[in-house]
Swiss-Prot record:
Keyword hit for Heme: yes
Binding site for heme b b562: 83, 182
Main subcellular location: mitochondrion
Native source organism of the sequence: Clarias fuscus
Name of the protein described by the UniProt record: Cytochrome b
Localization of this protein: Mitochondrion inner membrane
Protein's gene: mt-cyb
Miscellaneous notes: Heme 1 (or BL or b562) is low-potential and absorbs at about 562 nm, and heme 2 (or BH or b566) is high-potential and absorbs at about 566 nm.
Chain residues that bind a ubiquinone: 201
Cystine pairings recorded for this chain: none
C-alpha cells in the first residue's frame, strides 16, 4: 500500500515539493537562499503580527506605541528588534539569491526569474511603508522625499502624490494607509512566492556547472532538508546575535526623535538596503530622469535573460564574464556607500560614474563579453580540430 504522503491530495503536494523532489546532486550552499528567504518571511510575518497587536497607526500615538512595545510589553523589545533586523537579513538573503541567479544563469528560467523580480519590488515596497510606521524623523522625511518623487510623473504627478498622501502633506491619513499596506503586502508576497516555487518546479533547479542534471538527481529529503536546516541555524544565530547585542547597529539615530515637519534632518537617507538605488536616483540632476533610473535599476533584471548571448548557462567556465560579475558586486557596494554620503564633491561624481557602470555592465559589457567568449570558444574548437593528428 502506498504511503499516505504520496496519496493524500494535500500531503502529496507537500511531498512533491519538499520530500521526494528530485534535486541535482551537486548544488552548493548558494542554493540554500530560497529556503532561507522563506524562513525570513515567516519570522517577519510572525513578529509583525505581534507588533501589530500593540501598534497604533495615529500620528499622535505611533511613536509612543513603539516605545510602549519596547518598554511595557512582555518581550516586546525582542519582537521589535527581531522584526527590524529581520528586514536587513531578508534583504541580505535576497541580494545573495539574485547574485547566485546572475552568476549561474538561473535567469534563463524566465517565468521564475520574472516572478522573482516582481517579488523583489513587492518586498521593497513593503519595507519602505514599514519604515514609515515608527513615525520618527527619518520615517517622516523618508516618506516625504520618496513619495514626492511621484510628482515627476508628467501631467498627473501632483494629483498622484496628494492621492497617496491623502491630503496636502504626509499626515495621519498617510500613516494609516501605509500601515494597511504594510499589513496586507506580506500576504501578497506569500502568493507570489507560491507562484515562484510553482514555476521553479516546472523546470527543476539549475546547478553550478550549468549542465542537464536529469541523469544525476537525488531526493530533497534527507539530503537538502538537513543542508537547509544548517542554513536556518546559521541565519537565526546571526539574527539573534545582532538583535540582542547591537539591535540599533543598522538603524538611523534620527529615528529616535519623534517626527517633526518643521525640522529637516541634515541628511535624509533610506535604510542601508535601498542605498544603492538611492545613489542612482541622486546621480541624475533631473527629477524625472532620476525616478526612471531608480525604477530601471531594479527592472533592468528583467532584461538580463534577453541579453544572454553566451553558449553556456553560468559563469563557471567564463573568466571574462566572471570579472564583470565581481565588478558589478563591487559597483553595488560603492553605490551603497555613496547613497549614505552627503551630496557634495567627490561623492557626486563617484556616484555618477558608478551609476553609469551599473547600467553599462548589464546592457553593454556583459553581452559583449559573452559574444567575445563565444568567438574564443569557436576559435579554440577550430584550432584543436585543425591540429588533431589523422587516425591511421
Amino acid at each position: 500500500m502506498a504511503s499516505l504522503r504520496k496519496t493524500h491530495p494535500l500531503f502529496k503536494i507537500m511531498n512533491d515539493a519538499l520530500i521526494d523532489l528530485p534535486a541535482p546532486s551537486n548544488i552548493s550552499a548558494w542554493w540554500n537562499f530560497g529556503s532561507l528567504l522563506l524562513l525570513c518571511l515567516m519570522v517577519q510575518i510572525i513578529t509583525g503580527l505581534f507588533l501589530a497587536m500593540h501598534y497604533t497607526s495615529d500620528i499622535s500615538t505611533a511613536f509612543s506605541s513603539v516605545v510602549h512595545i519596547c518598554r511595557d510589553v512582555n518581550y516586546g523589545w525582542v519582537i521589535r528588534n527581531f522584526h527590524a533586523n529581520g528586514a536587513s537579513f531578508f534583504f541580505i538573503c535576497i541580494y545573495l539569491h539574485i547574485g547566485r541567479g546572475l552568476y549561474y544563469g538561473s535567469y534563463l528560467y524566465k517565468e521564475t526569474w520574472n516572478i522573482g523580480v516582481v517579488l523583489l519590488l513587492l518586498v521593497m515596497m513593503t519595507a519602505f511603508v514599514g519604515y514609515v510606521l515608527p513615525w520618527g524623523q527619518m520615517s517622516f522625511w523618508g516618506a516625504t522625499v520618496i513619495t514626492n518623487l511621484l510628482s515627476a510623473v508628467p501631467y498627473m504627478g501632483d494629483t498622484l502624490v496628494q492621492w497617496i498622501w491623502g491630503g496636502f502633506s504626509v499626515d495621519n491619513a498617510t500613516l494609516t494607509r501605509f500601515f494597511a499596506f504594510h499589513f496586507l503586502l506580506p500576504f501578497t508576497i506569500i502568493a507570489a512566492t507560491i507562484l515562484h516555487a510553482l514555476f521553479l518546479h516546472e523546470t527543476g533547479s539549475n546547478n553550478p556547472i550549468g549542465l542537464n542534471s536529469d541523469a544525476d538527481k537525488i531526493s530533497f529529503h534527507p539530503y537538502f532538508s538537513y543542508k537547509d536546516l544548517l542554513g536556518f541555524i546559521i541565519l537565526l544565530t546571526a539574527l539573534m546575535s545582532l538583535s540582542l547585542f547591537s539591535p540599533n547597529f543598522l538603524g538611523d539615530p534620527e529615528n529616535f526623535t519623534p517626527a517633526n515637519p518643521l525640522v529637516t534632518p541634515p541628511h535624509i537617507k533610506p535604510e542601508w538596503y535601498f542605498l544603492f538605488a538611492y545613489a542612482i536616483l541622486r546621480s541624475i540632476p533631473n527629477k524625472l530622469g532620476g525616478v526612471l533610473a531608480l525604477l530601471f535599476s531594479i527592472l533592468v533584471l528583467m532584461v538580463v535573460p534577453l541579453l544572454h548571448l553566451s553558449k553556456q548557462q553560468g559563469l563557471t567556465f567564463r573568466p571574462l564574464s566572471q570579472i564583470l560579475f565581481w565588478t558589478l558586486v563591487a559597483d553595488v557596494m560603492i553605490l551603497t556607500w555613496i547613497g549614505g554620503m552627503p551630496v557634495e564633491h567627490p561623492f557626486i561624481i563617484i556616484g555618477q560614474i558608478a551609476s553609469i557602470l551599473y547600467f553599462s555592465l548589464f546592457l553593454i559589457l556583459n553581452p559583449l563579453a559573452a559574444w567575445l567568449e563565444n568567438k574564443l570558444l569557436n576559435l579554440n574548437c577550430s584550432s584543436s580540430l585543425a591540429t588533431k593528428a589523422p587516425v591511421l
